[in-house]
């Protein structure tokens, strides 16, 4: 969804939206098949790594709400540390990022039951809310991850 926002040509945007829907549906089918086999699925809700100075990279993508609806529980996991540094020569190209040694802490929060989590958020919005409900749910996930990240960051 973040990449779609940058497409201004209506024809190209329509084409890219159709392509994006196909990818998302294939992903959803795959996630559902994994879930039915009892496999654990890890999803990065922002769709990318955070890039300092690019606050949009810290925002969760709304499609994560669809994954949440397919899943019984989720476990917020934060990864603190920076072993993949942005290239000074080409900061916009992640392929040029540098691998560096660093201390990394992987933290896990409490297991959260998806259905009640979503229902509570939507109930608090009220019936008259006309904004993007999916984005509100994902923003709450990102808020949980941010708090968790800050806690573990303080231990480093």
Stretches with model-predicted labels:
Residues 10-156:
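Non-catalytic C-terminal accessory region of glycerolipid acyltransferases
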Residues 1-11:
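Conserved nucleotide-cofactor-binding alpha/beta core module
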């Amino acid at each position: 969804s973040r990449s779609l926002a940058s497409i201004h040509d209506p024809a190209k945007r329509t084409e890219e939206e159709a392509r994006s829907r196909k990818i998302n549906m294939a992903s959803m089918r795959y996630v559902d098949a994994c879930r039915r086999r009892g496999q654990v699925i890890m999803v990065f809700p922002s769709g990318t790594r955070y890039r300092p100075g690019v606050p949009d990279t810290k925002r969760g993508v709304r499609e994560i709400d669809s994954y949440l609806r397919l899943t019984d529980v989720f476990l917020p996991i934060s990864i603190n540390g920076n072993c993949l540094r942005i290239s000074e020569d080409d900061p916009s190209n992640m392929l040029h990022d540098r691998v560096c040694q660093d201390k990394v802490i992987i933290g896990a929060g409490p297991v959260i039951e998806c259905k009640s989590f979503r229902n509570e958020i939507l109930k608090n919005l009220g019936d008259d809310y006309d904004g993007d409900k999916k984005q509100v749910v994902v923003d709450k996930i990102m808020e949980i991850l941010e708090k968790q990240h800050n806690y573990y960051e303080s231990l480093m």
